[in-house]
Amino acid sequence: MQILADLLNTIPAINSAAMSRAQRHVDGLLKPVGSLGKLEALAIQLAGMPGLNGIPHVGKKAVLVMCADHGVWEEGVAISPKEVTAIQAENMTRGTTGVCVLAAQAGANVHVIDVGIDTAEPIPGLINMRVARGSGNIASAPAMSRRQAEKLLLDVICYTRELAKNGVTLFGVGELGMANTTPAAAIVSTITGRDPEEVVGIGANLPTDKLANKIDVVRRAITLNQPNPQDGVDVLAKVGGFDLVGIAGVMLGAASCGLPVLLDGFLSYAAALAACQMSPAIKPYLIPSHLSAEKGARIALSHLGLEPYLNMDMRLGEGSGAALAMSIIEAACAIYNNMGELAASNIVLPGNTTSDLNS
């Protein structure tokens, strides 16, 4: 789809000059150089994002939760009933799920988006971008057509860009869908080249005696569908799911506006791998929130070259980790904008060679 290709080509590069200025500013703050560690690096990374105009700051915050069912659930790869997807989506509209509580704590809005829930009628209160009532069973067929994947990507990109126009400067991604760690593992295995046995985990408490079947399902899905690891859209369409496509769309949409997007857990790592295959230029806009407890998490993150800020043994999904980490983004912005400067206090520290702290 040419429209998608054209959009991917417009993703702005990180502003290295702005990052250099930010580095000098951070080095001149009222502290020993480097003493705030990763917060300093994060502030500098944010300064380089064109959508923030060289000054790390947070406006409105939004967590976009992509909700979808998966045909591969029929293969016995999850213990939760498929109906839980719809039930939990309804609970999100009431603000009672984990991501809703954590997002409220962070002052972020949660956008609950139906991209493929298997119900006869749309669920009231959800944003309706439903492509179909669940994806195909990847163990016996592709998850969706390439056209479906491309259209959903574009729809989500446009929605994300509209939020940016309305003042959102920090995005988080989340998902909801029974059995969705199976297609996520298939994506990670395909793109990293690692064997399914290395990346398939227990998801939402799958009994260990059922893990061998889940590994076999992922292996069969890859063998049958033959996704091209160099083509992110192909991977998503053949062994992914509508929720994974939606997450990738948020990443692409935020990056196209020069704005940061917080990853969540394993599902978001998989979507990020596919999105980076579509456009490597988005990678500097991706901020990893936490280390998922899912088995293939470190493999996916290593391939992305990302190191999470939190390690909380979390594997809920929903965007819970992204919501939790929003305070870290705000902290990085706060130190950049609100700390005093060494020069103003006539402090000269050994090793600080900054000549013009305000340049």
Curated annotation (Swiss-Prot):
Reaction it catalyzes: 5,6-dimethylbenzimidazole + nicotinate beta-D-ribonucleotide = alpha-ribazole 5'-phosphate + nicotinate + H(+)
InterPro entries, per the entry: Nict_dMeBzImd_PRibTrfase (IPR003200), Nict_dMeBzImd_PRibTrfase_bact (IPR017846), Nict_dMeBzImd_PRibTrfase_N (IPR023195), Nict_dMeBzImd_PRibTrfase_sf (IPR036087)
Recorded metabolic or biological pathway in which this protein acts: Nucleoside biosynthesis; alpha-ribazole biosynthesis; alpha-ribazole from 5,6-dimethylbenzimidazole: step 1/2
Bilayer-crossing regions: none
GO MF entries: nicotinate-nucleotide-dimethylbenzimidazole phosphoribosyltransferase activity
Keywords: Cobalamin biosynthesis, Glycosyltransferase, Transferase
EC number(s) on file: 2.4.2.21
Catalytic-site annotation from UniProt: 318
GO biological process, one term: cobalamin biosynthetic process
Functional summary from the UniProt entry: Catalyzes the synthesis of alpha-ribazole-5'-phosphate from nicotinate mononucleotide (NAMN) and 5,6-dimethylbenzimidazole (DMB).
Quaternary structure and interacting proteins, as annotated: Homodimer.
Family per record: Belongs to the CobT family.
Record protein name field: Nicotinate-nucleotide--dimethylbenzimidazole phosphoribosyltransferase
Organism for this UniProt entry: Escherichia coli O6:H1 (strain CFT073 / ATCC 700928 / UPEC)
Lineage of producing organism: Bacteria, Pseudomonadati, Pseudomonadota, Gammaproteobacteria, Enterobacterales
